[in-house]
Every structure is written in structure tokens, then in C-alpha cells.
């Protein structure tokens, strides 16, 4: 049998125009960028700086902040200055709705401090004011050499365009469904706005598009269509994904399918946090998604079995949890000290069934004893058994072996 039948790999990455957002490149065959958004009142400089810093430290490469009124616009340059004093050079993206033209015009320091402007075609202006107010933002973006994201959202769709397409569809011999017309409206809203931005003098290398909806199948359909019709860089995100497990699963499925097709240049996982919850979770989920799909490496992987009736205790679970926590804690220092350590794979297994095999496939692994097994834990490094641990301090001994391995393999000294 031909072995190639079983091989699978992502489709070739869609070719898009690269866009510089500060010092971060989006599109143009660059690695997929993880970004996030604050939920603080931007006018509260202290709170916003604190959250941006936390998102940056978690791994967000771009952070979007709301700019919804004069006080928020006035705070942006202060936030930028404070972050730079703290040593954080993260590009800030301004999120504008309704009065973006006014805020950018009246607060030039804000326009200068931001690395990108997000514009929503559905509420940039209405009626005769729409094109004029859109043009004002494009003129400011051109003046300050800033890129824009034209961010269409299902929940704030351009009603004039939707009405037009609904009326045209009604005249067809075989009309599309309402859902299909809405999908087409989302796509056309993004593309028509991008075309207008180009007519107004903004280069293709200054335009990113997004077309967010809250249904997984709709999102896949919209982005697949958008990817076929243009070569602009694309920002992926499932809007209103929800809370907890549901939000993680919905976003991961939708974005994972698109990424597997080669579609997507930057992602944001939109999760509704619990009250007082950790805002950085959306960054971690985004990184995990890209890493498990093999597109990027952010952190070492710890493989651990789920446990079953063969496992005698929770020792292997506790060890796996502790090792993963230690790796996460040390990564800010290790990225500099041990280049390449993010590609490390560690296996912590609970019995003889899959333990030795999984440990051999990892860079370093341990197979703890299960029910009825000899109270010994073989350690494997790069496929070879190097030691067998016994006694009450197996966990501590393995941690020491792991630390030595990291130093020897990734240390530059």
C-alpha cells in the first residue's frame, strides 16, 4: 500500500500582502500573529497599562484598545509613553466606532501613538456622511503612515448595503437564502471599503480585513469567500464566541479549519471572561491553537496520559502539572538563555501501556509505575533509556534530570 495515502499536511499558505503594524509584520508569509484586546476603560491609564503589559507578557504581539471618547483618545499617548518606560514596545491598535474621524482629527497625539486603526464600515458613518467620514480616517492614516483594519461585524452590518443586496436578490429567478445574502453582505462590505481606501490613496500594504460573525459555519464560509476574492492580509476571529469551554471550542474549530486551509494572517480568540477572570487566557488559547496545529512554537509541550484504572495514584498528574507550571514560569528567562527551548517535548506517563513508548517519542520522558508494576520509573532521553528512578523522590529527581537536559541541549555556553 502506498504510504503517502496516509500523509496529511496543511494546504499551502494563502499569499497575502504584508502589513507592518509597528514592528510586527502581518501577512506576506510571516508567521501568524496572536493579538488580543483590553476590556479596561482606556481613559484609566493605570488599569489599561497594567492589562496591556499582562497581555504582552502572556505573548500577545498586538493589543487593541477602545477609543470611544475624548478622554480615551487623550489617554492613548500617555499609555504609549508609560508602556515604553516599562520596556514594553507592543504596538497598540485603536478600536474606533461612530466618531473615529472626529477623535483622530481632534487628537493628533493619539493618531500618532497608535500603530493601527480599526474601522467598522457598519458604523463609520451613515447616509451621506459615511464616505466623507471614512475618507477623513483614511487621510489621517495616510498622513501618519498607519495601517488600518477594516473590521466588518455581523452584529453591526452596513444596513444600506444589506438592503440593496436583499432587494437585488429578491429579483433573481433563484434567490439565495437570507443567510447567504448576509454572508455576501459581510464580504462585500469589507471589499468595497478596502477598494475605497485604495482609491483614497492608502496602499494595499496598509490594509488588513476582517469579517467576523458568531456562527462557526458562517465564519468559515465568509472567510473562504473573502480569501478567494482578494490578497489583503486577513485577521481571523469568531465574534461573541462565548464563555468557558464553549468559547474555546467554537473559536478553535472555526479558526483551525481556516488555518488548515492556509487562510489567516493574524488571530484573536474572543472569549468572555468570568467576572474578575484572567484576560490573558485568550492569548494562551491562541498560542495553543497555533502550536498544536504545528504553525508556531511558543512553549515546551508536556504530554501526559489522562489516567485510568491501571494508574496507582495521581503522582504522574501532579508531576506533569508541576513541570508544565515550571516551564511556563521560566519561559520569559529561558527564551533568551536557551534559544529553541520552546520546541521541547516532555512526556510524563502513568503506566507501562503507553508510558515507555510515549516517553521515547518525546525529547525527555518518564514512565511512572501503574497498578501491579514494579515500583520503578524509567527515564528516556531522545529515545534512549538513561536511568531508572526508585524510591520516594522520583518527581524531584526527574525535575533535576530535566533541568540538566535543558541546560546541556539549549545552553550556549
UniProtKB/Swiss-Prot annotation:
GO biological process, one term: isopentenyl diphosphate biosynthetic process, methylerythritol 4-phosphate pathway
InterPro entries, per database record: Dihydropteroate_synth-like_sf, IspG_bac, IspG_bac-typ, NO2/SO3_Rdtase_4Fe4S_sf
Manner of cofactor binding, per the entry note: Binds 1 [4Fe-4S] cluster.
Pathway of action: Isoprenoid biosynthesis; isopentenyl diphosphate biosynthesis via DXP pathway; isopentenyl diphosphate from 1-deoxy-D-xylulose 5-phosphate: step 5/6
Residues involved in [4Fe-4S] cluster binding: 305, 308, 351, 358
Catalysed reactions listed for this entry: (2E)-4-hydroxy-3-methylbut-2-enyl diphosphate + oxidized [flavodoxin] + H2O + 2 H(+) = 2-C-methyl-D-erythritol 2,4-cyclic diphosphate + reduced [flavodoxin]
Enzyme Commission code(s) on record: 1.17.7.3
Keywords in alphabetical order: 4Fe-4S, Iron, Iron-sulfur, Isoprene biosynthesis, Metal-binding, Oxidoreductase
Top-level taxon of the source organism: Bacteria
Gene Ontology MF terms in the entry: 4 iron, 4 sulfur cluster binding; 4-hydroxy-3-methylbut-2-en-1-yl diphosphate synthase activity (ferredoxin); 4-hydroxy-3-methylbut-2-enyl-diphosphate synthase activity (flavodoxin); iron ion binding
Cofactor: [4Fe-4S] cluster
Pfam family, one: GcpE
Gene3D superfamilies: Dihydropteroate synthase-like, Sulfite Reductase Hemoprotein, domain 1
Function: Converts 2C-methyl-D-erythritol 2,4-cyclodiphosphate (ME-2,4cPP) into 1-hydroxy-2-methyl-2-(E)-butenyl 4-diphosphate.
Family statement drawn from the similarity comment of this UniProt entry: Belongs to the IspG family.
PANTHER family cross-referenced by the UniProt entry: 4-HYDROXY-3-METHYLBUT-2-EN-1-YL DIPHOSPHATE SYNTHASE (PTHR30454), 4-HYDROXY-3-METHYLBUT-2-EN-1-YL DIPHOSPHATE SYNTHASE (FERREDOXIN), CHLOROPLASTIC (PTHR30454:SF0)
This protein's name: 4-hydroxy-3-methylbut-2-en-1-yl diphosphate synthase (flavodoxin)
Organism ancestry: Bacteria, Pseudomonadati, Pseudomonadota, Alphaproteobacteria, Hyphomicrobiales
Amino acid at each position: 500500500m502506498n504510504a503517502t495515502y496516509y500523509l496529511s499536511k496543511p494546504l499551502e499558505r494563502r499569499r497575502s500582502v504584508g502589513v507592518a503594524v509597528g514592528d510586527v509584520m502581518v501577512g506576506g508569509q510571516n508567521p501568524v500573529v496572536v493579538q488580543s484586546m483590553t476590556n479596561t476603560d482606556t481613559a484609566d491609564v493605570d488599569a489599561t497599562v497594567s492589562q496591556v503589559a499582562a497581555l504582552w507578557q502572556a505573548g500577545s504581539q498586538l493589543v487593541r484598545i477602545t477609543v470611544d471618547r475624548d478622554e480615551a483618545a487623550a489617554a492613548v499617548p500617555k499609555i504609549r509613553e508609560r508602556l515604553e518606560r516599562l520596556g514594553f514596545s507592543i504596538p497598540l491598535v485603536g478600536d474606533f466606532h461612530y466618531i473615529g474621524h472626529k477623535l483622530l482629527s481632534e487628537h493628533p497625539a493619539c493618531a500618532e501613538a497608535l500603530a493601527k486603526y480599526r474601522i467598522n464600515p457598519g458604523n463609520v458613518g451613515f447616509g451621506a456622511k459615511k464616505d466623507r467620514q471614512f475618507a477623513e480616517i483614511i487621510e489621517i492614516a495616510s498622513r501618519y503612515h498607519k495601517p488600518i483594519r477594516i473590521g466588518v461585524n455581523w452584529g453591526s452590518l452596513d444596513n444600506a448595503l444589506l438592503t440593496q443586496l436583499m432587494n437585488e436578490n429578491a429579483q433573481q429567478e433563484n434567490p439565495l437564502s437570507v443567510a447567504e445574502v448576509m454572508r455576501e453582505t459581510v464580504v462585500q462590505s469589507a471589499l468595497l471599503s478596502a477598494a475605497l481606501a485604495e482609491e483614497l490613496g492608502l496602499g494595499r500594504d496598509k490594509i488588513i480585513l476582517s469579517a467576523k460573525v458568531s456562527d462557526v459555519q458562517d465564519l468559515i464560509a465568509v472567510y473562504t469567500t473573502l480569501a478567494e476574492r482578494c490578497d489583503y492580509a486577513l485577521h481571523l476571529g469568531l465574534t461573541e464566541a462565548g464563555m468557558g469551554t464553549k468559547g474555546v471550542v467554537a473559536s478553535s474549530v472555526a479558526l483551525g479549519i481556516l488555518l488548515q486551509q492556509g487562510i489567516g494572517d493574524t488571530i484573536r480568540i474572543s472569549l468572555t471572561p468570568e467576572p474578575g477572570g484572567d484576560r490573558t487566557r485568550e492569548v494562551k488559547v491562541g498560542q495553543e491553537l497555533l502550536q498544536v496545529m504545528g504553525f508556531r512554537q511558543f512553549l515546551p509541550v508536556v504530554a501526559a496520559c489522562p489516567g485510568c484504572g491501571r494508574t496507582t495514584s495521581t503522582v504522574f498528574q501532579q508531576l506533569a502539572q508541576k513541570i508544565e507550571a515550571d516551564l511556563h514560569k521560566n519561559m520569559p528567562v529561558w527564551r533568551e538563555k536557551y534559544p529553541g527551548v520552546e520546541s521541547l517535548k516532555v512526556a510524563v506517563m502513568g503506566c507501562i501501556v503507553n508510558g515507555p513508548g510515549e516517553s521515547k517519542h518525546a525529547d525527555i520522558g518518564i514512565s511512572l509505575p501503574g497498578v501491579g508494576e514494579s515500583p520503578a520509573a524509567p527515564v528516556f532521553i531522545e529515545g534512549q533509556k538513561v536511568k531508572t528512578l526508585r524510591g520516594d523522590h522520583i518527581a524531584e529527581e526527574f525535575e533535576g534530570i530535566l533541568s540538566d537536559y535543558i541546560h546541556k541541549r539549549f545552553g550556549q555556553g
